[in-house]
Amino acid sequence: MRSAIFAAIALTISTALAGPESDSEVAARKAALDLAGAFTNEGFKMRDGHWTGTIKPKEHALIAVNLYAGNQYWFSVGATEPAKKISVNVYDETGKLMETESYSEGDKAAAGFSPTNSGQYYVLVDLVEGDASSVCLVYSYK
């Protein structure tokens, strides 16, 4: 009984904190999904869920992800105006920059990665040029 109450409280708090997405966040998600669509044509499946937020100049968004050896991943990011250029990088749990295939065109960027070890990795989204903007990260795998 007690754990059910705590679970209900935790769900209420997380739902309240999440709140509805702004129009800008929805536009960033659309841009990320448009980019990720190119990878679904190559057999990649979209992972459920996404991450949205605001990124400012000289600040980074760091998102932890669990990846499995033997899979291939594409991390796709879309941003809204006034972002002019964004980048995506992948780091292992020790902070080592991983070698990735990369794509970047203005307010959209992607990084392709195939881990040799399963575990936690970090995706770093960086606003290279422009002012504070909404961004969205989605990823796909095969």
Roles of regions detected by a PLM:
Residues T12, V26, G37-F39, D48-W51, ...:
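Short amphipathic alpha-helical segments, especially helix-boundary/capping motifs
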Residues G19-F44:
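Predominantly extracellular/luminal regions of secreted and cell-surface proteins
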Residues I9-A18:
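Hydrophobic h-region of N-terminal signal peptides that target proteins for export
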Residues P20-E21, G49-S134, S140-K142:
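Acidic, Ser/Thr/Pro-rich low-complexity intrinsically disordered segments
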Residues F6-A7, A31, M46, I63, ...:
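Generic detector of short alpha-helix boundary/capping microenvironments
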Residues M1-I5:
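Positively charged n-region of N-terminal signal peptides that target proteins for export
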